[in-house]
Amino acid sequence: MRASGQGPQRRRRGWATRDDSAVTFRDPQPRQPAGGARALRGPDPRGPARAHQAGPLLAGARRSQHMVGGAPPRPAETGCSRSRMTQKNSKLCARANVYTQVPDGGWGWAVAVSFFFVEVFTYGIIKSFGVFFNDLMDSFDESNSKISWIISICVFVLTFTAPLSTVLSNRFGHRLVVMAGGLLISLGMITASFSQRVYHMYISIGVISGLGYCFSFLPTVTILSQYFDKRRSVVTAVASTGECFAVFAFAPAITALKEHIGWRYSLLFVGLLQLNIMVCGALLRPIIIQGPGQSPKAVTLEPRREVQYMLENEKTRTSIDSIDSGVELTTSPKNVPSEAKMEQETRAEQQQTLVTAPKHSQMKAPLLDFSVLKEKSFICYALFGLFATLGFFAPSLYIIPLGISLGIDPDRAAFLLSTMAIAEVFGRIGAGFVLNREPIRKIYIELICVILLTASLFAFTFATEFWGLMLCSVFFGSMVGTIGGTHIPMLAEDDVVGIEKMSSAAGVYVFIQSISGLAGPPLAGLLVDQSKIYSRAFYSCAAGMCLAAVCLALVRPCKKGLCQNSHSGENQTDRQRGKALQDIPEDFLEMDLGKCEHRAHMKMDPV
């Protein structure tokens, strides 16, 4: 905007203030009693009107500098300017990224790296916890099933508190929630290293660290899915390999570390490493994406016109010309800014309006949308996750005890877990590239992998020596990698709920998994305690995967409407029409009832 009609126009960022007739923007710098450091910059290119705003002291200093021929100092040379630049840069780093469409890159690559290390210090540690099982049984003199409850409670809290994680992320942002989760994880693991009873670990690792795992993992994978569209499958699959590399590295490393410093100090060391999750959470910048059919100009002008209409409600005259044709607004031209002026303000403050407009809509959005439970396709997919969780954690926990029970050396048994992790890496990456192809229906690929995973779980019960377990571990790792890296991002696909409901659907989906997460490892441990055979633990995993395959096969038919009655579409259309009528503001429109009645009489007259 120009000052006194002089000088070239300069685009500036600022806060918007609105009065009855115009929209002005003020400088976002701190208030100063007399013009501030801007008065030291010399002649203002926007004219003398700006110079008169400076105080007499600073204005006199500026005149004296021009009299002696000295150039005014740069803003960077003053301490006040440096502090303002630091504050500006910090606000820029904390500001949300605004895109007109899904970027498929940009800052999303930093988010992908953060998700990789979050996977390392969350699920990587959970899957590597099996190396402590024999030490905990000897130290606490407890049975296998009671030790299994540590991970069971942890997984239960991780999944049960998923809706809470979604609500907190929508309320306070993903970054703050993930950083708080990293602190809780480290606190619980460090506290567990001083435990004297097994139930102490139920609270420290099970409850405290389990809550931290939920706060760290779910918001990270949710915001990563928002940064990518076409590359979502491959990026998520590659980033999720962090847990695989963690298992490959941590299993032999922790085993060797225990021999030198004991299991307690090893657990303390792991807890300190998990503080890095707070660094990963600091990189999660929020993202705002406009509607797919809106141009920047349309998104910018619409909120401004809406505010203008609200401020000038008494000066606006509207009427309903016809019941069938909808609502027609008739507004006085003097109350609407000119098109040239509107475009001029649009170009100058496009970024500020794009940032503030979505926030206005987000304030009205629910913190947790339970409407996903009305979709039968989501219910079937949630049941798939419920039964599949039985087979996710137990094999990694019992593969080392199974190898030791068959007479395999403990070091070679730990190598089985590392081999499983490496195979999982290739499974995740391969699934990412396969699912990234457009013609492929992704949910069918996942169904095939679930069936093959069920077969691999049954194969563990027939292995009797090292190479048989090695073959089963490779096959199981590759299949669980394809499922583990895609089952949550699959919610963003149109076959389930779509990207719009991804955040709420992920919270509800993981919450439903909590039941099997609590019952899975203890059920496997109970079978081991009764039979004294570790291979029996894989029967419950295989049975759960069979039921998961059946539920997953029903997702696509439910989405296509084959499982719905014929009247569901009509009822949904009626509800949408009723909602559209309720959204019309009553105090905004002044209905011309006389005009409507006149047209109604005209229609009733015979021709």
Swiss-Prot record:
Keyword Cytoplasm: no
Chain segments annotated as transmembrane: 106-126, 147-167, 176-196, 203-223, 234-254, 269-289, 384-404, 415-435, 443-463, 466-486, 508-528, 537-557
Record's function text: Monocarboxylate transporter selective for taurine. May associate with BSG/CD147 or EMB/GP70 ancillary proteins to mediate facilitative efflux or influx of taurine across the plasma membrane. The transport is pH- and sodium-independent. Rather low-affinity, is likely effective for taurine transport in tissues where taurine is present at high concentrations.
Disulfide bonds: none
Entry keyword annotation includes Methyltransferase: no
Region of interest (Disordered), residue spans: 1-84
One Pfam family from the record: MFS_1
Cytoplasmic-side positions: 1-105, 168-175, 224-233, 290-383, 436-442, 487-507, 558-607
Keyword entries, A-Z: Cell membrane, Membrane, Phosphoprotein, Transmembrane, Transmembrane helix, Transport
GO molecular function: taurine transmembrane transporter activity
Residue ranges annotated as Extracellular topological domain: 127-146, 197-202, 255-268, 405-414, 464-465, 529-536
Superkingdom of origin organism: Eukaryota
Subcellular location(s) per record: Basolateral cell membrane
Main location: membrane
Gene: Slc16a6
Classification via Gene3D superfamilies: MFS general substrate transporter like domains
Protein name: Monocarboxylate transporter 7
Organism lineage string: Eukaryota, Metazoa, Chordata, Craniata, Vertebrata
Subunit text: Forms functional complexes with BSG/CD147 or EMB/GP70 ancillary proteins.
Family listed: Belongs to the major facilitator superfamily. Monocarboxylate porter (TC 2.A.1.13) family.
